[in-house]
Swiss-Prot record:
FAD binds at G13, G14, G15, H16, A17, G18. It comes from the Bacteria. GO terms for cellular component: cytosol. This is tRNA uridine 5-carboxymethylaminomethyl modification enzyme MnmG. The lineage of its organism: Bacteria, Pseudomonadati, Pseudomonadota, Betaproteobacteria, Burkholderiales.
């Protein structure tokens, strides 16, 4: 049957990508439907019970700055918070939290069920409704047909998923959930470029059988306890608990090696490529054969369960080997496994078949987000989901897409890497992937993105008010530091020595003093000449005050480096966003090598910037392209069948 209500946007899948996509589209005022195979698993943490980390925490902060749910849900469900790289520079500091699975999932579901313009429906999707080169809806397992103007597909590991434990395997999207076999077959019919990837998860352990007295305790940060959302409060956190650390040993490694003849990875049963930066314990032992021990973190799954997640032993070895290797580690000698670890193979679609908006090039109105694009991780999925939801919303409103730049957000780095370089293994975000990481810090994600989010319609009044107060306070106080001067007469030798280690010998601005090593903003405020009086409205908001102080201190101390990077960005921007005609005939570009013509024709970059990052495209090739465009020779090749529309301005 055809469902009587027509929607603007349909989101397929209720994981981290799907929930952010649905919420973003609905916040923009679009009539949005979220289709999920099981409403009880909305926002489920399928693997590790944690959010954030190096690079990943940056993405979560950006999602939050754009009004997303992940950071806020983590504040409500987080049972341990830490700042990683706290002793290093601000560019690489990152927030990480352990989350109670049940509380996190409840926080996400609460937001979905209370979001205006958003409807939920429980049914697996077996088919997409496509008319010509345009998607017009989705069909569920029992034949209910939902019409829409755009569809966001966030299928996770469910597309033709196959679960492996030893040499036993069965179809599944994750343990306990069915695979989306029919939908996968339908997507293959649409001739979208497809491949197979693999990921895995460790066995879960009953905490009652762990001897914690033999383990190293790892508490979270307590002074202060971090928050994830820019609107978060420590009071939102539930009870905080520690993690625990054990190690593999020579016996563990021997056990693993003895089981490799029954490993689906080492017997050729699994064909998909696994994540390089989250390897299975089999891979670790094989790749790092000389390493005598690997650190294993025992992470609590929640406050109302005894289940522990042993981070570091993801495996698809047979269950008897899993049990033996777990019990070979200190503190786990009598451990009981509650759930076996497993590997899962699944379909993904080459992200080079996407526009930078995450819309497929072949089918108008169809957007992909999350693991379907070859990424791994909750945070990468949430960021893509948010962007796909925003751009699906803009699409149905007949507006141009928003495609964040590499110098604007880690989200821009993520998407640009995917659509220009593709993936040969599951993609994970790191700070090292961002060439402008000093400008793309966790602390300034709101300064970079919240104003854009407000214009897009995804930032509400509460967030906008808090952001505006913070932005204005940072601006006023930074200016005061630059224009307030002290000299040997106004700054006593005692104060100067206490702050700087010696008296000053001539006039300095307070900003000059703050730039000195070891001098903090609080230290400057402790001077008689440096006393600052925060707005009365901010005086009782400790979290906002801490954010303001951090922004001021980083902005002043790193001003020279930030300005230098801004200059570099400006120079590179000259041609970064110069658009290429969608169907430019690269065989007509004089001087291009055969390889360059072949790759440009295959991947069809949208901009000069994207073209420059395709493997094998040299600076000389880019120069030839620019000359071709300036001569007005950007003639279009015959339009390929099924090509989508793109209303964005192009260089002609």
């Amino acid at each position: 049957m055809l469902y009587p209500t027509e929607f603007d946007v349909i989101v397929v899948g209720g994981g981290h990508a799907g929930t952010e996509a649905a919420l973003a589209s609905a916040r923009m005022g679009n009539k949005t439907l979220l289709l999920t195979h099981n409403i009880e698993t909305l926002g489920q943490m399928s693997c590790n019970p944690s959010i954030g980390g190096i690079g990943k925490g940056h993405l979560v902060k950006e999602v939050d700055a754009l009004g997303g749910a992940m950071a806020a849900a983590t504040d409500e469900g987080g049972i341990q918070f830490r700042i990683l790289n706290s002793s290093k520079g601000p560019a690489v500091r990152a927030t990480r939290a352990q989350a109670d699975r049940i509380l996190y999932k409840a926080a996400i579901r609460h937001r979905l069920e209370n979001q205006p313009n958003l409807w939920l429906f429980q049914q697996s999707v077996d088919d997409l409704m496509v008319e010509g080169d345009r998607v017009v809806g989705a069909v569920t397992q029992v034949g209910v047909r939902f019409r829409s103007r755009a569809v966001v597909l966030t299928a996770g590991t469910f597309l033709d998923g196959k679960i492996h434990v030893g040499l036993n395997n069965y179809t599944g999207g994750r343990a306990g959930d069915p695979a989306a076999v029919s939908l996968s077959a339908r997507l293959k019919e649409l001739k979208l470029p497809q491949g197979r990837l693999k990921t895995g998860t460790p066995p879960r352990i009953d905490g009652r059988t762990i001897d914690f007295s033999k383990l190293e305790e790892q508490p979270g940060d307590l002074d202060p306890i971090p928050v994830f959302s820019f609107l978060g409060r420590v009071e939102q956190h539930p009870r905080q608990v520690p993690c625990w650390v054990t190690h593999t040993n020579a016996q563990t490694h021997d056990i693993i090696r003895s089981g490799l003849d029954r490993s689906p990875m080492y017997t050729g049963v699994i064909e998909g490529v696994g994540p390089r930066y989250c390897p299975s314990i089999e891979d670790k032992i094989h790749r790092f054969a000389s390493k005598e021990s690997h650190q294993i973190f025992l992470e609590p799954e929640g406050l109302t369960t005894n289940e522990f997640y042993p981070n570091g032993i993801s495996t698809s070895l047979p269950f008897d080997v899993q049990l033996e290797l777990v019990r070979s580690m200190v503190g786990l000698e009598h451990a009981h496994i509650l759930r076996p670890g497993y590997a899962i193979e699944y379909d993904y679609f080459d992200p080079r078949g996407l526009k930078a908006s995450l819309e497929t090039k072949a089918i108008s109105g169809l957007f992909f987000a999350g693991q379907i694009n070859g990424t791994t991780g909750y945070e990468e999925a949430a960021a893509q989901g948010l962007l796909a939801g925003i751009n699906a919303g803009l699409y149905v409103q007949s507006k141009g897409p928003w495609c964040p730049r590499r110098d604007q957000a880690y989200l821009g780095v993520l998407v640009d890497d995917l659509v220009t370089r593709g993936v040969s293994e599951p993609y994970r975000m790191f700070t090292s992937r961002a060439e402008y990481r000093l400008s793309l810090r966790e602390d300034n994600a709101d300064m970079r993105l919240t104003e854009i989010g407000r214009e897009l319609g995804v930032v509400d009044d509460v967030r906008w008010d808090a952001f505006s107060r913070k932005r204005d306070a940072v601006s006023r106080e930074t200016e005061r530091l630059r224009t307030t001067w002290v000299n040997p007469k106004t700054l006593s030798s005692e104060e100067a020595t206490a702050l700087l280690g010696k008296p000053i010998d001539h006039e300095y601005s307070l900003a000059d003093l703050l730039r000195r090593p070891g001098v903090s903003y609080d230290g400057i405020c402790g001077l008689r000449e440096g006393t600052c009086g925060p707005d009365e409205a901010l005086a009782h908001d400790d979290v906002l005050l801490a954010q303001i102080k951090e922004q001021i201190e980083i902005g002043v101390k790193y001003q020279g480096y930030i300005e230098r990077q801004a200059g570099e960005i400006e120079r590179n921007e000259a041609h970064e966003n110069t658009r290429l005609p969608e169907n430019l005939d690269y065989t007509e570009v004089r001087g291009l090598s055969f390889e360059a013509r072949q790759k440009l024709t295959q991947f069809r970059p949208e901009t000069i910037g994207q073209a420059s990052r395709i493997s094998g495209i040299t600076p000389a090739a880019i120069s030839l392209l620019m000359v071709h465009l300036k001569r007005g020779l950007g003639r279009r090749a015959p339009r390929p069948a099924g090509a989508g529309n793109d209303n964005s301005p192009v260089a002609q």
